[in-house]
Amino acid sequence: MLPSHVLEVSITPRGPNGGARPNEGRHVATSNNSAEGLARTDATRQAKRQVMKSTLFILRQLVTKDFKLKYRRSVLGVLWSVLNPLLMMAVLTLVFSNMFRFPIEHYPLYLILGTVLFTLMTDATGGAMSSIIDASSLLKKVRIKKWVFPLERVLFSLVNFLLSLVAVLGVMAFFVLFAPAESRLAFPGASMLMLPVLLVYVVVFSVGIGLALSALSVFFRDVMHLWGVVTTAWNYLTPVFWPQDLAQLAASMPNPQLLGALQAVEQFNPMYHYIVYFRDIFLYGTVPGLQENLVCLGFALAMLALGVLVFCKTQSKFILYI
């Protein structure tokens, strides 16, 4: 027995005079409409793919341009991305090891891990904040997605962070291979594979802040000055230099009663959770659990949603203020 769809094609209903019935033309018109709909859908998909390819090309070109401009006429060039965190680590280790004497094992590695990750966030958000204003001449001449510019600055900061990991790995290698036996660090191993997950959290979080700041700074230029003050205070409220274990910090605090307030602040400090995550996988060799991953993801998605909302609400008016 033939399938039903074969019977429908093979047997054509005829009218009284042997011609096609009136409904036949209706079936043909329906088939033509379906074909046109499929063609339009395919054209739409191709157009979206082309837009995506163009956007990725623009992002790649902008990141390359910024990278070349940053190291133009520099003798050491890209090596500064490695030397900067090393020099900062050396200075801060000297200061905090002699003045405050926090009981933190492998303090130079502890310090550089906190420094490079916090620097990623501050560089990404600070660059994204001024991206729309810096691209004002281009936005007035070319029709282009405005969110490309804040996103590009975040990706550029991510590239610099990946280069600074060379310095982190160098310090880690020292403690793993050359440190005295009593203070030698065990190689973290498989926990380091969680780094891409952490970077997704931090990049998404930074994109959210960057979108909001880039939109607000177009209308209120004071935001660009205020953000520097905010990040400085944020840096000191985050355990970059001091112990992330607040019980260790209590002995060094002039007023131990502040410990409870600080604990409450840290629970709502996204960078506290991201830096603890970073040290867990690189310094302590532990894989963060589900709860910590959900907290980090929640901060990232909440900030991204806020940034997208602010940016989409205001981007149509950018051209009037840049």
What residue spans do the PLM features occupy?
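Hydrophobic transmembrane alpha-helices and immediately adjacent juxtamembrane helices
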Residues: 2-19, 23-322
